[in-house]
Amino acid sequence: IVGKSYSCTDCGRSFYAKGHLLNHQKNHGGEKRFTCTECGKIFTRKSNLRKHQRIHTGDNLFTCTECGKRFTEKRNLLIHQRIHTGEKPFTCTECGKSFNLWSTLRNHHKIHTGEKPFTCPECGKKFSVKNSLRKHQRTHARKKLFTCTECGKTFTKKSTFHMHQSTHTGEKPFTCTECGKSFAKNGNLRIHQMTH
């Protein structure tokens, strides 16, 4: 983390050299010109389109021997395999906590520095991670994303919406393997399982 002095204002990623930052920023603001004919996804670089197209053709994919998930790049497979091995090669020098991704360590480090480069344009609240800002911005949305057709209640999260819908349908998809009792919410199943 120390020594990386060029930071991307869009995602917070840091670089040692200004040239690397400028090259990276093309991904955010570049004119997207290369379109996948299979799925319509658009890319700023032809090389990224070619890599993406391997998903559709199945050519030169790297497959995880543990779970079968496939990747277009070997480095992404190696990063993914840390899920199975439990390897966490990136350690915080401040508190000793370890992470499986460099980007996760970088975001964690902001806890110690107090850095919050992402500001909500609606209310001015600041965040250390862009994803946290995105989640927060959904709370400002005038029109909620998911509306229940039964009662009109609205939700910003799809998972909460589906959970709510089960109150109308009576659906109980979470079943205890010990006794067969079913629950509408996974959390209720977990609480129940502690009784066995």
From Swiss-Prot:
Example GO BP: regulation of transcription by RNA polymerase II
Keyword annotations from UniProtKB, A to Z: DNA-binding, Metal-binding, Nucleus, Repeat, Transcription, Transcription regulation, Zinc, Zinc-finger
Zinc finger residue extent: C2H2-type: 6-28, 34-56, 62-84, 90-112, 118-140, 146-168, 174-196
Cited PROSITE patterns: ZINC_FINGER_C2H2_1, ZINC_FINGER_C2H2_2
InterPro entries (alphabetical): Znf_C2H2_sf, Znf_C2H2_type
One cellular component (GO) term of this entry: nucleus
Compartment list: Nucleus
Pfam families registered for this protein in UniProt: zf-C2H2 (PF00096)
Molecular function (Gene Ontology), one example: RNA polymerase II cis-regulatory region sequence-specific DNA binding
Broad class of the protein's primary localization: nucleus
Family assignment from sequence similarity: Belongs to the krueppel C2H2-type zinc-finger protein family.
UniProt function note: May be involved in transcriptional regulation.
PANTHER family for this protein: GROWTH FACTOR INDEPENDENT 1 TRANSCRIPTIONAL REPRESSOR (PTHR24390:SF159), ZINC FINGER PROTEIN (PTHR24390)
Protein name, per record: Oocyte zinc finger protein XlCOF26
Organism: Xenopus laevis
